[in-house]
Amino acid sequence: MSISDVKILAFGDPNRNDNAFKVFSYCKSIGAQTKYVTCEENESFATFNHGNIDWRESTNGIHWLVNSAETILLGKSPKSAVGAGMTFGELEGAKMVMVVDVPDNPDDISIIWGFVISRIRQIHVLFITSRALEAISNLEEIPISSVLETIRNRGLVPHVCSYSTEEKKALVEYSTGSISVSTEENIQPLEWLARYICKLPFSGTGEIGIKDACLA
C-alpha cells in the first residue's frame, strides 16, 4: 500500500478557504485520492439542503473524513452536515479527522470545543493548532503541556496531535504512549497533518509506525 491508495474526503466551505480544504489540498498534492464535499453553487452554505449529500456513498471505502470544527459556526446546515457525515462515515468504516483552530471570533472557541467534546468518541485523529492549545488550556484550566494527554485520556481518542512550525516539532498522544518528533523540514501544521494521515494507514499503529508517519 502507498499514499496513492489512501482515500480522503473533506467537507467544508464552498469558498474553499477553511482548514478542511487546506488539509484536502495538501493530501491531494502528495498523491492521495481526494474529494471535497460542499453545497451546490446556487445554495447558501448556511442554509443549504444538507440532506442531499449521500454520505453513505461518499464515505464508502474511504480511509479518512476530514472536518474543521469551525465549520459548525457557519450555520445550522453545515453543523448538521458535519454531524451526519461523521455518523454515516463511521457506519461505513471511515475514520474521522477533526481540526481544531481558534475561530475568527476567539470567544467562539468554547462553542466549537463543546461540539468536539460531544463527538469525541467518533474522532480518530484530533489535531489541535498551537493557538488552539492555549485557548483550550484556558477553557479546561489545565497546563498547555498537558492538553493533548488530558484530552486523549478523557476522550479515548486514538490520536491527539499538534505541530509547531517554529520548533519543527510534532507531538502525538496515542493509545499506548506519546511521541515528540522533530521534522527535518519547516512545514505548515496542516501540511504535517496531511502527511501524517496519508502515511498512517500503512505505517502501523505501534510506536515505530506512528513515528514513521510523523516524519512522512
Identify the residue ranges that each predicted region occupies:
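Ribokinase/PfkB-type carbohydrate-kinase core domain
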Residues: 1-216
